[in-house]
Amino acid sequence: MQLDNILSQLFENQALTKAESQYFFEQVIQGNVSNEQLAGALIALKVRGETIEEIAGAVEAAFANATTFPTPDYDFADIVGTGGDGQNTINISTASAIVAATLGYKVAKHGSRSVSSKTGASDVLSALGINVAISPQTARQALDENNLCFLFAPLYHAGFKHAVPVRQTLKTRTLFNILGPLVNPAHAKRQLLGVYSPEVLKIYAETVRTLNHQHSIVVYGSGLDEVAVHGETLVAEIEDDKIHYFSLIPEDFGVQRHSIEALRGGEPTENAEKITVLLQGKGEAAHIDAVAVNTAMLMRTFGERNLKANVQRVKDLLRTDKAYQTLQKLAQYQ
């Protein structure tokens, strides 16, 4: 296979096979593609729209070159968004992961520093005093003992660093936004995946189905890569090799509506302060409800289908400081 041929295909608007995509992204990960070539390829893919085969090939390339994580044989999940929704909200997925772990659900959260928003998952966790760069063995220990670990993407997918200058220069969503949530190094087979557009929802669901997940849910929440409390959430639920599409509104979870402005965050320190207050049992109503609906959806991937009951469990918890204790325990893993 020749890199030049693959680039020519992309520039002539031809889709790549899974094998061609895997080859191309392995070349990227190994540092064999120039910034100019990569920028051109990512834009060509974005403008045409990435296919399931192209995304799946990139996923295979990432896993083939990743640092291994000792995957446990018990059930665990991930909750992660593509980012790139441009809304700069507080880190709802990160807070939800901490809450779910406190309720007894094991979560291996995959994430990185922000490239296309103000504050990524690892930015806010660092501000909360968490060492995001712990070894795979220490992270596994945290998952075993504390129901929660954070897997810092650059540690596991070191080759992605070759794409960072291009991503930062382009300042737009690319296949790497799509890729991140799908390449959890622990190989999570239960995931709540947030996407940045309704168009990506279907292609994401189809891609997840090819990756043999047990029970995963893809959501797009009226402009957010999360379950929304300000409007409708489009849902694709992947279970037993079938995809079920439906939509939900805040009332389906038993919560009231809040404006998206009520969820706005900012720099990592600001987001960390808001999340700390929330986990200590003193959160704002909008923050509580946003975390409750997202945690409720994550619980569903473990078979807890009653969303209103799930929300109630979260709200009861967020009247205490138990979730903050989980965060403090996580900070002890160095």
From Swiss-Prot:
Needed co-factor(s): Mg(2+)
Binding site for Mg(2+) 1: S93, E226
Binding annotation for 5-phospho-alpha-D-ribose 1-diphosphate: 81, 84-85, 89, 91-94, 109-117, 121
Protein origin, superkingdom: Bacteria
Any GO BP: L-tryptophan biosynthetic process
Binding site residues for Mg(2+) 2: D225, E226
SUPFAM superfamilies xrefs: Nucleoside phosphorylase/phosphoribosyltransferase catalytic domain, Nucleoside phosphorylase/phosphoribosyltransferase N-terminal domain
One GO MF term attached to the UniProt entry: anthranilate phosphoribosyltransferase activity
Residues binding anthranilate 2, per UniProt: R167
UniProt keyword Electron transport, yes or no: no
Gene Ontology CC: cytosol
Binding site residues for anthranilate 1: G81
Top EC category: transferase
Enzyme Commission (EC) number: 2.4.2.18
Gene3D superfamilies for this protein: Nucleoside phosphorylase/phosphoribosyltransferase catalytic domain, Transferase, Pyrimidine Nucleoside Phosphorylase, Chain C
Alphabetically ordered keywords of this record: Amino-acid biosynthesis, Aromatic amino acid biosynthesis, Glycosyltransferase, Magnesium, Metal-binding, Transferase, Tryptophan biosynthesis
Pathway(s) of this molecule: Amino-acid biosynthesis; L-tryptophan biosynthesis; L-tryptophan from chorismate: step 2/5
Catalytic reaction list: N-(5-phospho-beta-D-ribosyl)anthranilate + diphosphate = 5-phospho-alpha-D-ribose 1-diphosphate + anthranilate
Cofactor comment: Binds 2 magnesium ions per monomer.
A Pfam match: Glycos_trans_3N
Subunit structure, interactors included: Homodimer.
Reported function: Catalyzes the transfer of the phosphoribosyl group of 5-phosphorylribose-1-pyrophosphate (PRPP) to anthranilate to yield N-(5'-phosphoribosyl)-anthranilate (PRA).
Family per record: Belongs to the anthranilate phosphoribosyltransferase family.
Protein name stated in the entry: Anthranilate phosphoribosyltransferase
Organism of this sequence: Actinobacillus pleuropneumoniae serotype 5b (strain L20)
Annotated gene: trpD
